[in-house]
């Protein structure tokens, strides 16, 4: 059977369901696919296969569907730990999320934790589905729960007053009954997602950035750096900066080649070699990035949200304490750094997720939301994301 051609006509957006255990995330996911995609039964989604991202095992279900306006890729995780790992490793990048809250319970501990994580790892937009409304008889109670959700979102710097909240029953939609709280509400939810969660800028439209993987010297031509263009476009003749590890340097790209052919440009997703003017072989190294001047700056101090692997995942067998000094693997290279634990935390156990401070011994081209691995002698022991740059 030939693979169906992927229709590129509609804008593509990545979203996911988040929220407390048993509030109905997977039921909602199934209900959406029933109305807008190839129907996936609850069990198909819930029995998500395990996959490895940065050496960490995560169970994630991927479904896709489309509205009139857009094509969506949607992730749903069976367990709370899977969400934490997913959000921190960025295994499934989300442009926005549907926060599912049981109307009868209101916000619960994991509701709060997922909102906080969303804020820390840079999920820019959320839409709320208040589920299981058929279990609440009292209209006033629904209003109270809605108020509580809005306040909670605002306390984590989401615009709680503006976020669309749709109240309905995912199960009713899935079972095809009570359309006024079922099907109609799923349609209303997807309309809100269409309207409220903006289409992200495509990678080629963002400022140019390429992590340097290798450096070669070509006699008579100069220095070539190779890597995969992460975003943006580079044209021959563009002025660019080399950022990270050493002082930032300006240079000009005098050539772009791919598969040994000369091109006039390279764009997001391309593996290229870029010829740099006036830079010698010793003047540039793996771990630095090429970027549009002024778009990214080098930093050594930041706050991070991290997940520490369990022994079973191949991580540490013992806890670590203040002043722990592992390597932080950013893009293509390891840099040693010192960890500062938050007030009141004495030690960190394998399997924990937490926020901590890091100071690197050399600067790295860094932005909020940049992912990294925590390593000890080449072995991955954790994963993290830069939540706030300090200096």
UniProtKB/Swiss-Prot annotation:
Q: Which residues bind Mg(2+)?
A: 26
Q: Where is the signal peptide?
A: none
Q: Which residue numbers delimit the tr-type G domain?
A: 10-201
| InterPro entries membership | EF-Tu_GTP-bd (IPR041709), EF-Tu_GTPase (IPR050055), EFTu-like_2 (IPR004161), EFTU_2 (IPR033720), G_TR_CS (IPR031157), P-loop_NTPase (IPR027417), Small_GTP-bd (IPR005225), T_Tr_GTP-bd_dom (IPR000795)
- What positions does the entry give for GTP binding? 19-26, 76-80, 131-134
Q: Where is this region: G3?
A: 76-79
**One example GO MF annotation:** GTPase activity
| Stated role | GTP hydrolase that promotes the GTP-dependent binding of aminoacyl-tRNA to the A-site of ribosomes during protein biosynthesis.
Cited NCBIfam families: EF-Tu, PRK00049.1, PRK12735.1, PRK12736.1, small_GTP
- What's this protein's name? Elongation factor Tu
Please give the organism.
Answer: Dinoroseobacter shibae (strain DSM 16493 / NCIMB 14021 / DFL 12)
Query: What would be the name of the gene that encodes this protein?
Result: tuf1
